[in-house]
A protein has these predicted regions:
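Beta-rich carbohydrate-recognition and catalytic domains
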Residues: 1-149, 154-195, 208-255, 278-319, ...
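Beta-rich accessory regions
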Residues: 234-433
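Repeated scaffold domains used in trafficking and secretory/extracellular systems
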Residues: 197-202, 259-262
Length: 433
């Protein structure tokens, strides 16, 4: 596969994504003992181009009381040539029955910690960790259990950290500020009704003159694998006092409803680049690993709307022309075409149709997971729709109308079947890393 995944076991959220010392660094929420969620570690990989990754094994692991039951999600930032990692550490109050890798009904406690690496390769898990945001002592400000996922960035006003939290079953964002990355002060709080009971993995940044919030609120579904989904919102944000407002409705980051926990940073050319976790069925048995990330996506704002594209480093690999009927359907492929109103097609087992108001997909021929809906749709109107379809063994990413919307979903594998493919369709492929 060309998509990022661990060599074995479980991964979920992308963490610590950064271009540092002329390399891309990417960490993953990782469970080293099997293909299921459990005591979280950070697994580390590096890349020169965001496409081919070198696995470096575990970077962060539980080592002190505040993170003894998991090194949860977080982010990375460079300062004075060093790589600073921020994450949530958890301590279980009890355990699930016969499983020390999950908490029991009493839940857990959360701290925010930092670790500084001198070079991006060396991580002192025993003496290098420091608590930077303590356990909450006032649950009316932030919850002692459900406060997590620090994203840290620098602006002209210093350093800012945003955390997801909850109070009285309503999600909120906490904004902390610092001058030195060590001492943090709560600056502001954002809360809005109707967006779920807990905000996970917040990511706030400016692109094309517009502030954007990516976040994963819990309790907004149910859709797909989970009732928790990833969303995007155009935001009004004042970095001087961290005042945030979301004047427009939030939208799904992806219409496949199977992505979660996006994390962004700036690539080597200044593009806002996003990595996103694709959730996979728990019974996935075809590989030693479970969990993968989308191709890195570039986010822009055009005419006041988000626009997504596959990163240019990925696109330039798809230079080998291929023929329908002769291509191995489980090799990485890209198909570019246009569907007119009323047309349908079958692309390697994925059925796609357009009725003038929405684009529909049907993956029933290439999934077997019971209870998982085979159908999905993207709202779009017109007489025709432009499609850019990327397939890679266990996943398809469908970019609609040049990235105005995207639909990404898991599949068991593609078929040789093709039918009613428009004559102008262009099919290309590439080698794996």
């Amino acid at each position: 596969m060309l998509h990022f995944h661990a060599p074995e076991n479980w991964i979920n959220d992308p963490n610590g994504f950064i271009f540092y010392n002329q390399q891309y660094h990417l960490f993953s929420q990782y469970f080293p003992y099997g293909k299921r969620w459990g005591t979280m570690h950070w697994r580390h990989a590096v890349s020169e181009d965001l496409v081919c990754w070198k696995d470096l094994g575990i970077a962060l692991f539980p080592s002190r009381p505040e993170d003894q039951n998991g090194v949860f999600s977080g982010s990375a930032i460079e300062k004075d040539g060093k790589l600073h990692l921020f994450y949530t550490g958890v301590q279980y109050q009890d355990f699930a029955e016969n499983n020390i890798h999950k908490n029991g009904p009493k839940g857990f406690l959360s701290w925010q910690l930092a670790l500084t690496s001198p070079d991006g390769y060396t991580f002192d898990n025993f003496d290098g960790k420091k608590v930077v945001v303590p356990l909450s002592t006032d649950p009316e400000i932030y919850d002692p259990q459900h406060t997590r996922d620090p994203k840290v960035w620098k602006s002209e006003h210093g350093y800012t950290m945003v955390l997801g939290s909850t109070v009285q079953k309503q999600g909120r964002l906490l904004f902390f500020v610092s001058e030195d990355l060590e001492h943090w002060t709560l600056k502001n709080i954002f809360q809005k009704e109707g967006l779920g009971w807990m905000f996970e993995c917040p990511d706030l940044f400016e692109v094309d003159g517009q502030h954007v919030l990516l976040f994963s609120p819990e309790g907004t579904g149910p859709y797909g694998f989970d009732k928790n989904q990833a969303y995007i919102a155009l935001a009004d944000f004042d970095p001087s006092d961290c005042a945030l407002d979301l004047p427009k409705p939030v939208e799904p980051i992806d219409w496949g409803m199977e992505l979660y926990a996006p994390q962004s940073n700036i690539d080597s050319n200044g593009r806002r680049t996003v990595m996103i976790w694709l959730r996979m069925p728990s019974d996935f048995a075809a590989e030693k690993w479970i969990g993968l990330y989308t191709y890195p996506r570039v986010l822009n704002i055009e005419n006041g709307n988000p626009k997504w594209s596959v990163h240019p480093n990925v696109l330039k690999r798809f230079s080998q022309k291929a023929e329908f009927g002769r291509l191995d359907p489980n090799a990485p492929f890209r198909m570019q075409t246009t569907l007119k109103k009323g047309e349908t097609m079958n692309a390697f087992g994925l059925k796609i149709g357009f009725d003038g108001t929405a684009l529909y997909t049907d993956r029933s021929a290439i999934i077997t997971t019971p209870g998982l809906s085979p159908a999905a749709y993207v709202p779009c109107e017109g007489q025709e729709v432009k499609l850019d379809l990327f397939g890679d063994k266990y996943v398809f990413e469908l970019f609609v109308n040049e990235g105005q919307q995207v639909l990404t979903q898991y599949v068991n594998g593609f078929e040789n079947a093709v039918d009613s493919i428009p004559s102008q369709a262009v099919l290309t492929t590439t080698e794996e890393c």
